[in-house]
Regions:
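Inter-motif core of Ras-like GTPase G domains
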Residues: 89-110
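Conserved C-terminal guanine-recognition region of P-loop GTPase G domains, centered on the G4
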Residues: 114-136, 140
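C-terminal boundary of histidine-terminating zinc-finger modules
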Residues: 173-192
Length: 198
């Protein structure tokens, strides 16, 4: 049975597409079949895949969660379907959350990022959807990182991923290149897969 992972954040610029594609590749490298459903009207994941010859897994455009079954079928029933959602777009985000076995909620560490994340997190918790917060685009020297860790770890409504996605020029330049796993993405992939084994 295909497990659905929806990457959701109502705030833009949090790295949802990068997380979706790079996580898919890291999970694929673990030996699992993956597919990505691109629900963002900007179609960033689709555009990424079209720039790469022999992209390693299928990415398809979707407009609603009812399209997920077609992606799964055409992807030969992958082990994991990762859904890249748009910022805003409440109807699609809601459908994607309801269809998910796990929601990943990427966020930066600025006060505005955390405020928006807590609003989204409260909404997901009201829906009863298993959720993990992923700190993304983070400068490890940032003092806010420790504060955010303490604040989110104290929140028992969602898991906080141990893996932190750092700010790196290389991470910003992956768009349009063939995805390859790195220690950071491999670590996050192991956490995500382990969540389904518990």
């Amino acid at each position: 049975m295909t497990r659905v992972i929806s990457v959701i954040q109502s705030k833009g610029g949090t790295g949802k597409t990068t997380l979706s594609v790079m996580l898919a590749e890291a999970i694929r490298k673990m030996g699992y079949a993956v597919a990505v459903a691109d629900g963002d009207p900007q179609q960033s994941a689709i555009r990424w895949a079209t720039k790469v010859k022999d992209f390693p897994f299928p990415i398809e455009s979707v407009r609603s969660s009812s399209d997920f079954s077609g992606v799964v079928r055409r992807g030969n029933n992958p082990d994991f379907l990762i859904v890249d959602t748009p910022p805003g777009g409440l109807a699609f985000i809601t459908e994607s959350a309801e269809a998910a076995d796990l929601v990943l909620l990427p966020t930066g560490v600025s006060p505005m990022d955390i405020d928006r994340t807590q609003v989204t997190l409260s909404w997901l918790m009201e829906m009863g959807i298993p959720t993990a917060v992923v700190l993304s685009n983070v400068d490890r020297r940032e003092r806010l990182l420790d504060e955010v860790h303490a604040e989110l770890e104290g929140d028992e409504t969602a898991a906080l991923a141990e893996t932190v996605i750092p700010t790196r020029a290389a991470t910003r330049r992956v768009f349009g290149t063939k995805p390859s796993s790195t220690k950071v993405w491999d670590s996050l992939a192991r956490e995500v897969v382990a969540a389904f084994e518990d």
